[in-house]
């Protein structure tokens, strides 16, 4: 695709990419503010899916059309269309919900989805898999009835806003969480399409306007976090816009703003690369929404609409320069950034088990492998959480590590909730640190982009890694391990110490050199290798780490220090070196 750049005398970098717009831009332009013909399509009983532009437009309403890839070939032989069903992702800024909401969510999963499960995602919300077309409208109405929605959790908008799950510092977490909600609400689309289609609200005569997102919305997906150091559980460097909380005597006073992180790449396309976020500066809290809006509108106007593979904020920053982007944000917000305030990250993992907060309430973080809540043989996780929800008076909090926190438990209720959790397999004291720090995306059988297994592959693979670590005497340690089924990066393998990126069925690219804090991108070490080859490499490397590491040296740092792999310093230029 030929692209030409428009240069500005004020900003010497190329600000806007001119050329033929992508078909996604046509679709958004013609969609009548995201309505399309979704309402009519819902009444078409001849197909289980959505047709034409509606296939993509439903993403703005929080859904993806999928099918069961395990039976796709079989259905094709029978001359049947794929078994279409929708993934629906809830908007849940900061991951906080009430037990009453959870019980309704649980009931719908059991009664109205193919798989019967609730999947906690690493974007701190939950999603349903396997919603048939006849249940699409009811799920939106169910969410609305409990004060939730699925608006803007997919496609070219600001997605679900993450917030550090930090129940110990309850007051600071609450302040950060309130800002996550405010940012989410401020950046929502203003179109009435969602309410008209799903809630049967009457169309009004007024003209739709999108003062922030614009009539063609953003060039690409946009992700935002609110981060409370020293925890980087939200993996800020995977996100377009990040607000790092700066506190004074336990009170939130402002944010460091970082822009332009992102992990997605395309195999074989060296114009795509992961990127860590760049520091723009510090702002006091009263400027938060103005800065959020200015970053979004700058990306709206300057982002590449001619090539979706280069449309994210990270590519805009590389094209126009961080300083130019910063100046534009300042001009639009009417705010000058101050110097970045000191901050430090020490880890990303959740504190599994019971912790006591400064408010004297107790908080139980449950490890949910792969975030998949279902009644397994001997481990009825879904039933257990429902039983806890019936008696718990605090919050349920979903984490960006796909776990769940029973938050705000008074001392008198602690023993009862602990007993229920153990009875239903929600607490397992034998779970290793390695398993707690391993993560995978969904991948097969529902994800249409999957190239290799991830969620179904991870549990047994971790067992093999655990065995290797035990053999080398480091069984109590952990390595941040992530598996993603394709290079789009949902499993965040590009911020792992060991990252596996799906290349084909049974084959992965092996990346090394990230760190525990999530501030360094790993480099590809071996390409397109199978599980046996991966385990052989891991065995050898863990042996070296166990023998030659320095005190408290993480595996990723060890691989860099000993020149096993070179660090990625400037991914736009050296990721593929």
From Swiss-Prot:
Q: Which residues bind [4Fe-4S] cluster?
A: 441, 447, 486, 490
This protein's source sits in the domain of life called Bacteria
Gene Ontology BP, a term: hydrogen sulfide biosynthetic process
EC number of this enzyme: 1.8.1.2
Keywords tagged on the record: 4Fe-4S, Amino-acid biosynthesis, Cysteine biosynthesis, Heme, Iron, Iron-sulfur, Metal-binding, NADP, Oxidoreductase
> Which pathway does UniProt place it in?
Sulfur metabolism; hydrogen sulfide biosynthesis; hydrogen sulfide from sulfite (NADPH route): step 1/1
Q: What sort of enzyme, by top EC class, is this?
A: oxidoreductase
Cofactors demanded by this protein:
siroheme; [4Fe-4S] cluster
Q: How is the cofactor bound?
A: Binds 1 siroheme per subunit.
Specify which residues bind siroheme according to the UniProt entry for this protein. 490
Reaction equation(s) it catalyzes: hydrogen sulfide + 3 NADP(+) + 3 H2O = sulfite + 3 NADPH + 4 H(+)
Using the record, list the residue span of the signal peptide; answer none if the entry has no such feature: none
Q: Which GO terms describe its cellular component?
A: sulfite reductase complex (NADPH)
Q: Which GO terms describe its molecular function?
A: 4 iron, 4 sulfur cluster binding; heme binding; metal ion binding; NADP binding; sulfite reductase (ferredoxin) activity; sulfite reductase (NADPH) activity
Under HAMAP family, the record lists: CysI (MF_01540)
Task: Outline what the protein does.
Answer: Component of the sulfite reductase complex that catalyzes the 6-electron reduction of sulfite to sulfide. This is one of several activities required for the biosynthesis of L-cysteine from sulfate.
Family, similarity comment? Belongs to the nitrite and sulfite reductase 4Fe-4S domain family.
NCBIfam families assigned to the protein according to its UniProt record, in alphabetical order = CysI, PRK13504.1
What's the subunit arrangement here? Alpha(8)-beta(8). The alpha component is a flavoprotein, the beta component is a hemoprotein.
**Protein name (record):** Sulfite reductase [NADPH] hemoprotein beta-component 2
Q: Which organism is it from?
A: Pectobacterium carotovorum subsp. carotovorum (strain PC1)
């Amino acid at each position: 695709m030929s692209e030409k750049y428009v240069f500005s005398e004020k900003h010497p970098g190329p600000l806007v990419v001119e050329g033929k717009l992508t078909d996604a831009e046509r679709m958004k332009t013609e969609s009548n503010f995201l309505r399309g013909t979704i309402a009519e399509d819902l009444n078409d009983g001849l197909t289980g899916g959505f047709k034409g532009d509606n296939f993509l437009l439903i993403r703005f309403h929080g859904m993806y059309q999928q099918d069961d890839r395990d039976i796709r070939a079989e259905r094709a032989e029978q001359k049947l269309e794929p078994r279409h069903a929708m993934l629906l992702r809830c908007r849940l800024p900061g991951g906080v919900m009430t037990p009453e909401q959870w019980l309704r969510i649980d009931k719908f999963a059991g009664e109205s989805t193919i798989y019967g499960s609730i999947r906690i995602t690493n974007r701190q919300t939950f999603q349903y898999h396997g919603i048939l077309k006849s249940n699409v409208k009811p799920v939106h109405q169910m969410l609305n009835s409990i004060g939730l929605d699925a608006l803007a959790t997919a496609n070219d908008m600001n997605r679900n806003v993450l917030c550090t799950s930090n129940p110990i510092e309850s007051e600071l977490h609450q302040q950060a969480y309130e800002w996550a909600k405010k940012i989410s609400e401020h950046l929502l689309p203003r179109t009435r399409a969602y309410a008209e289609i799903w809630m049967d609200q009457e169309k009004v005569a007024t003209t739709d306007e999108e003062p922030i997102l614009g009539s063609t919305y953003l060039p690409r997906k946009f992700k935002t976090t609110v981060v409370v150091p020293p925890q980087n559980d939200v993996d800020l460097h995977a996100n377009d816009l990040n607000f790092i909380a700066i506190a004074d005597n336990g009170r939130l006073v402002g944010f460091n703003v970082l822009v332009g992180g992102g992990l997605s790449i395309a195999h074989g396309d060296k114009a795509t690369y992961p990127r860590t976020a760049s520091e723009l500066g510090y702002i006091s809290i009263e400027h938060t929404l103005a800065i959020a809006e200015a970053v979004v509108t700058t990306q709206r106007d300057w982002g590449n609409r001619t090539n979706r593979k280069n449309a994210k904020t990270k590519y805009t920053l590389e094209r126009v320069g961080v300083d130019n982007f910063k100046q534009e944000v300042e001009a639009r917000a009417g705010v000058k950034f101050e110097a970045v305030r000191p901050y430090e990250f020490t880890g990303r993992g959740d504190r599994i088990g019971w912790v006591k907060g400064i408010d004297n309430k107790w908080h139980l973080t449950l490890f949910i492998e792969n975030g998949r809540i279902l009644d397994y043989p001997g481990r009825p996780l879904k039933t257990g959480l429902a039983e806890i929800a019936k008696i718990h008076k605090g919050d349920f909090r979903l984490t960006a590590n796909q776990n769940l926190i029973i938050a705000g438990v008074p001392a008198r209720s602690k023993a009862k909730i602990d007993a229920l959790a153990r009875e239903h397999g929600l607490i397992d004291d034998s779970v290793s640190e390695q398993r707690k720090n391993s993560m995978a995306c969904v991948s097969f059988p529902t994800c249409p982009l999957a190239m290799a297994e991830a969620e179904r592959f991870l549990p047994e693979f971790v067992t093999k890694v655990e065995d290797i670590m035990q053999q080398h005497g480091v069984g109590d340690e952990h390595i941040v391990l992530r598996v993603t089924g394709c290079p789009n990066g949902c499993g965040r393998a590009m911020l792992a110490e060991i990252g596996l990126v799906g290349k084909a069925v049974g084959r992965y690219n092996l990346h090394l050199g990230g760190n525990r804090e999530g501030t360094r991108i790993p480099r590809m070490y071996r390409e397109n290798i199978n599980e046996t080859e991966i385990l052989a490499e891991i065995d050898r490397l863990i042996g070296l780490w166990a023998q030659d590491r320095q005190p408290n040296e993480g595996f990723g740092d060890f691989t860099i220090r000993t020149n096993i792999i070179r660090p990625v310093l400037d991914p736009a230029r050296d990721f593929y070196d």
